[in-house]
């Protein structure tokens, strides 16, 4: 291990020659992480975690603080970019069999859960209408836990309803969790370099490797530059493209928005939750929609690592991508036919991808077996 650390330090880490642009998302995520920590740090200097002042402090940041509007928009758009990159990163891992590197995959799934928790706490902080009601709906799911549910919810809220203590602790959690993400990212990278990256062919890369620097550093810099330009263009010309109009109104516990929904990057999980007409069942499906990723290394039965030469699994993968998009779309719609039916069918297909993984692997082995 010390030898590998020295190689990383001098940029001489041996990396497969044939890894494609799909392997660039790791460095893009690192850039997003740095951007979020920096902008978040400056925003926290001017933010006030109090239900009477939080909304006003956001207005103060955007209007009165020098470049505050840029910091606030960079932080909001940066979060969306973070999730775009992480979903692409996970899709790459699923397609090219990166999940067979078990420890790396399990640490990565833990990172995803931590990131989703951080983003959820952050969405509550502006104390707008959608912030308040999204927090109410999601935290209320804890009450579905038998016996302990109500006690856990009261403990999380710091009272009998979402109030000042809730906002204060959500701000504290939103501030501390990114440091956990950074620590876990270091573990993720160290575990990755134990065995090295996979490659598009799913073969052993040991026979054909090149130094990480300068080849992959320049390749990374190109996509990082493209990502930063995209973020800056969005911040400059479409800063509110991801915002919900409801969130421009201060939180009012007496007025319920017509359609409560979280940020776009949670819509697929929220859509799965809504598709089940039972509180506990929906909450379990919500948790399982993320946790099912943990099963992938243990259900792989194919002799081939990558999906490059697995047509049946390729079909299921692209069905999963389409399903993910459909669930995200239906979650933005009212809870009424045909949207409920569409999201129920799409949710079943979503879980079918993971359940069919061992069966399709076994079938492909039978088809490709040479006598």
From Swiss-Prot:
Component of the ubiquinol-cytochrome c reductase complex (complex III or cytochrome b-c1 complex) that is part of the mitochondrial respiratory chain. The b-c1 complex mediates electron transfer from ubiquinol to cytochrome c. Contributes to the generation of a proton gradient across the mitochondrial membrane that is then used for ATP synthesis. This is Cytochrome b. The gene is MT-CYB. One of its GO terms (cellular component) is mitochondrial inner membrane. The keyword Disulfide bond does not apply. The keyword Metal-binding applies. It is found in: Mitochondrion inner membrane. A ubiquinone binds at residue 193. It comes from Candoia carinata. GO terms for molecular function: metal ion binding; ubiquinol-cytochrome-c reductase activity. It is a multi-pass membrane protein. Keywords: Electron transport, Heme, Iron, Membrane, Metal-binding, Mitochondrion, Mitochondrion inner membrane, Respiratory chain, Transmembrane, Transmembrane helix, Transport, Ubiquinone. The chain crosses the membrane at residues 25-45, 69-90, 105-125, 170-190, 218-238, 280-300, 312-332, 339-358. It comes from the Eukaryota.
